[in-house]
Every structure is written in C-alpha cells, then in structure tokens.
C-alpha cells in the first residue's frame, strides 16, 4: 500500500497540512517542536484508529479548536485508490471511513493499512512492564489475523466482567464467575496458540536483522511465557479465583503473558548498553516489517522517527540498507 497524500486539520500542533509523498522514501527535517513526529502520528492514526502516544482522542485536537480531521489517499498494489477519513469533534464520537463508508467497528479497519513505526517510545519495550511487550505481539498479529483480534477483544471484555465481580461487595454466584471464565478460557487459548506460533516464526527473522546491524557482535533471543502453557486456562482461572477475590482483580491469564527479551541468555533490560538496546529495538521493528510483508496481503508502511540516536556510525550505515 502506498500513501500518496495526506490532509490534516487541527491535529495536535498541526493546524493545516497538505503533503504529497514519493512512492518510495520520504524524509522530513526540521527543528524540535515543528511537528515531524505528529505528522508520523497522523499517518499511524489512519492505520490503527488511534494515536501511537495518546489514547484519549479528544486530547489530540489542537488547542482552542473543536475538531480534527485526517484524510489519507492511498494506492493499492493493483492501482486501486483508497481514501481513509478520520474526524473527531469534542464531546462527540470519532468517525472512521473508508471510501466515504463509515466503519461500524474500528476493529474492522485494523490490518487494512499495515504499518510499523520505529520511535524513541520503543524503549518502553525493554524498560517498561510486560503490558508493553504484550502490546507488541498484539499489534503485529492483529494486523494479519482477524481471528486473533476478535479473540483478544472477547477475552478483554470477559476479563473486565470477571474483575467487576471480583470487586463486588456482595456475594456472587459461582456460576456467574464460570460464565466469564469459560469465555476467557476459550478466547485466551486462541490468543495463546497464535502468540506462540508467531514468536516461533518471528525469532529467526529478528535474529537475522540484529546480526546484520550488529555485524554478528552479539546473540539475541526472545522467549514467551504464559499461564496457558502448562495447564488448562479454565482450570488456572478457577484455581486462582479465591485469591483473586482477595486482590480484587485477575492475577492469572493470558493478560499476564510475558515476552522475554534476551541478550545472550540474560534479560537485555539488565545487560544491554544504550547502543545494544537501540540496536535490539530497531532490529525488532524491522523484523516486524519484514514479517508483515511476508505474511500479509500488502507491503506495510514503515515510519522511522529519530532512530539513529545512541547508535555508533557503523551501525547507522548498516541500518540505512536494512529496509531495502
């Protein structure tokens, strides 16, 4: 998919922007605060129906304005034109349209415009909690597997309902817990299997990119841990129920999965230098791009935001050639 042109009104600090793009490589230069990252974020919004940095849509409206609009004009590999529209007014629901037809569910759009973004915020994949690493898996898999996305949505809805019951000040029938636990188990098993299969296929691609950028200086890896690996997820949830009641939330399930990021045999969070961490993250995202290119129906868009900081000159030179 090629982004031919974008039109932006009142998005973050961008008052009015109209830009046409080259079909291959586009570079943006400017001082800090001019809106380069916000321009990339607007492109991201058109793929994921949300900002990469601020999930509260109304806060992405430019100060002292009442709305924002983002329109993207694309061209598919067969030459078919595609127009994506997003509009948001304060105190109103967000609208998302493809070729002037509004989506009834935003999830129906996910994967239509596959996209990978490399940015300074990626450092949270290493430094942050396990939720950041689960989100990485979710973002990749959801862009090529609708069954995964639907199962993840069902699981999260059931999880929210179970957590509500766990917080109840009044006695709750065990059968009611079982309803949501069965839904969590059914959807969670799908999520687990697909995460496991993804990681198995993804690891050699990631290692290849890291090896290329680092010139074989280090070995890296990924390992995936889940409560669903060694036992029935339904039994895990039932056995954890009494403890969960005390805590007021669900302690076990695929929402607690962990993706371990390794430098050699040790967590890169503890062992990696700034340069190694940056190389690891860039290789991870370039592998994501390559994986989606192989797996999906169209070539993803690749957004690179300030990626050369903390890399030595030799790795920067190698990185220039990697996307090609």
Question: Which stretches of residues belong to each language-model region?
Answer:
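Non-catalytic, surface-exposed connector residues within folded enzymatic/regulatory domains
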Residues: 33, 51-54, 64, 127, ...
């Amino acid at each position: 998919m090629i982004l031919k042109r974008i039109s932006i009104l009142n998005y973050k600090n961008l008052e009015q922007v109209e830009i046409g793009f080259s079909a291959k490589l586009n570079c943006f230069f400017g001082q800090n605060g001019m809106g380069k990252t916000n321009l990339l974020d607007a492109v991201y919004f058109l793929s994921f129906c949300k900002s990469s940095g601020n999930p509260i849509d109304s806060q992405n409206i430019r100060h002292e304005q009442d709305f924002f609009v983002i329109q993207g004009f694309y061209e598919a590999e067969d030459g078919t034109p595609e127009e994506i529209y997003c509009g948001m007014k304060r105190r109103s629901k967000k609208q998302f349209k493809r070729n002037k037809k509004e989506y009834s569910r935003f999830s129906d759009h996910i994967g239509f415009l596959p996209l990978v973004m490399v940015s300074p915020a990626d450092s949270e994949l290493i430094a942050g909690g396990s939720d950041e690493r689960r989100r990485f898996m979710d973002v990749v898999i959801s862009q090529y597997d609708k069954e995964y996305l639907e199962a993840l949505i069902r699981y999260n809805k059931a999880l929210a309902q179970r957590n509500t019951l766990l917080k109840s000040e009044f006695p709750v029938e065990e059968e009611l817990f079982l309803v949501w636990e069965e839904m969590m188990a059914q959807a969670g098993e799908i999520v687990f299997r697909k995460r496991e299969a993804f990681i198995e296929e993804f690891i050699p691609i990631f290692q290849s990119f890291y090896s290329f950028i680092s010139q074989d200086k280090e070995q890296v890896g990924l390992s995936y841990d889940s409560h669903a690996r060694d036992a029935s997820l339904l039994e895990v949830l039932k056995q954890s129920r009494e403890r969960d009641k005390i805590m007021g939330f669900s302690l076990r399930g695929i929402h607690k999965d962990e993706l371990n990021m390794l430098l050699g045999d040790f967590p890169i969070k503890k062992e990696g230098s700034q340069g190694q961490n940056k190389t690891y993250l860039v290789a991870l995202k370039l592998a994501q791009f390559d994986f989606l290119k192989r797996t999906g129906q169209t070539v993803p868009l690749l957004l690179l935001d300030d990626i050369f900081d903390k890399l030595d000159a030799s790795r920067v030179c190698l990185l220039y050639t990697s996307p090609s």
